[in-house]
């Protein structure tokens, strides 16, 4: 790390978290305190993007940076007689590639632009591909970092790979929103992406184990939710009867269905074995198909209940009973969402890899041959290989309405703020003008 203050912070971070590390102050481009060439089994890195003031003369003879070629197109002069590299992206890529042992592996975060960079950088990329260093490329969603808004890609190196194909994964549509401006991967999304690579390596057991863990989590929540559903159903039925609703929704079929599903899971769980992958996968697909109608019926039931409660609320808006019931229904919706969460991940996996085997999936992943990569001028942009598919957002009608109302509230607030600013600006201009 080149900045002393950051070195101190990093050392403090290591100390307070009980980690080990050897952090030194130096400028990586010009110094090599770790003697890194061919030294490391693993490298994980998130270097700065697009550094444009690296002195070309100081790095072009360094084997850490020139083994696969030096970026030198469109070099510019910062000081008289000092030629600089166009940017440092491919210096970092070179550094991490040359730091690996013969069977070493690396993962690094890099600006999206590096995947398609042209001229000398394209030649470096071609050299890396032809030397079979690159295992895979993964496009990240935007707004994944708090301080960097640029879209980024993960590069994976594996010097021990024997297959010359490259795995491309486009994960830009896989994310969990934190707020309007920031996103993250949930733990389940990380596992779903990782299992693509494991399937590519023919590790099918990890796939059925992951699906099995989702079933365990989902059904444990369904068991708890089933009890809540019984309690709320009694209150809803009594409430609607009190207000003389003619067609009171019947909760019994859904409650019975939940009980049947739990019994089916217990039977599946008792016989589950990851050793027999094809049999386990077949049983998992069958179990998931039984779950889908349950949630469809449940959502339809709750939609009907919400509609009836809204009609009653129009004429009795101040009723404490209605407010209390609405609170319980909101809690019920939250529990449904939490319960359905793990089953949604099961559906996501089974829709794309129904046989528990790797397969190219349009819009998600592609195992590209060297000839296919040559056709794309050695681009490493996953979007060029995986294709595009238009997917539905997966929201229920209630979730869509809730999101629209939330966005409308935000727009109303922004419009009010804009009017205040407009008045303030007008007032200030008049004050200045006298």
Specify the residue positions occupied by each region the protein language model found.
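S-adenosyl-L-methionine
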Residues: 3-38
């Amino acid at each position: 790390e080149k900045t002393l203050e950051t070195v101190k912070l990093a050392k403090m971070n290591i100390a307070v978290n009980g980690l080990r590390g050897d952090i030194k102050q130096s400028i990586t481009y010009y110094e090599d305190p770790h003697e890194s060439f061919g030294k490391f089994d693993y490298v994980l890195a998130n270097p700065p993007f697009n550094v444009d003031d690296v002195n070309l003369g100081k790095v072009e003879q360094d084997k850490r940076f020139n083994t696969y070629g030096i970026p030198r197109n469109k070099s510019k002069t910062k000081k008289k007689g000092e030629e600089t590299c166009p940017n440092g992206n491919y210096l970092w890529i070179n550094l991490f590639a040359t730091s690996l042992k013969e069977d070493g592996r690396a993962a690094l975060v890099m600006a999206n632009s590096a995947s398609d960079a042209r001229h000398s950088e394209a030649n470096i990329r071609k050299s890396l591909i032809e030397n079979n260093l690159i295992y895979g490329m993964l496009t990240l969603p935007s707004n994944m970092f708090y301080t960097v808004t640029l879209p980024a890609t993960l590069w994976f190196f594996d010097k021990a790979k024997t297959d010359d194909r490259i795995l491309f994964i486009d994960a830009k549509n896989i994310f969990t929103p934190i707020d309007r401006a920031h996103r993250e991967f949930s733990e389940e999304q990380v596992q779903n992406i990782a299992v693509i690579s494991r399937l590519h390596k023919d590790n099918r057991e990890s796939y059925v184990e992951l699906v099995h863990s989702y079933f365990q989590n989902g059904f444990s929540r369904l068991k708890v939710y089933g009890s809540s559903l019984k309690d709320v159903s009694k209150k809803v039925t009594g409430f609607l009867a009190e207000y003389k609703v003619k067609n009171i929704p019947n909760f019994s079929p859904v409650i019975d269905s939940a009980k049947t599903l739990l019994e089916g899971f217990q039977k599946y769980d008792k016989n589950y074995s990851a050793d027999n992958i094809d049999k386990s996968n077949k049983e998992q697909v069958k179990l998931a198909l039984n779950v889908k109608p349950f949630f469809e019926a449940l959502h339809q039931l709750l939609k009907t209940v919400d509609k009836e409660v809204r009609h009653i609320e129009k004429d009795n808006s101040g009723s404490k009973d209605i407010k209390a019931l609405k609170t319980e229904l909101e809690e019920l919706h939250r529990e449904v969402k939490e319960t359905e969460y793990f089953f949604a991940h099961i559906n996501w996996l089974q829709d794309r890899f129904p046989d528990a085997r790797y397969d190219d999936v349009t819009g998600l992943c592609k195992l590209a041959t060297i000839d296919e990569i040559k056709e794309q001028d050695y681009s490493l942009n996953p979007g060029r290989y995986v294709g595009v598919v238009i997917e539905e957002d997966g929201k229920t009608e209630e979730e869509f309405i809730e999101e629209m109302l939330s966005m409308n509230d935000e727009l109303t607030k922004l419009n009010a703020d804009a009017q205040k600013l407009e008045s303030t600006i007008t007032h200030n201009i008049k004050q200045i003008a006298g």
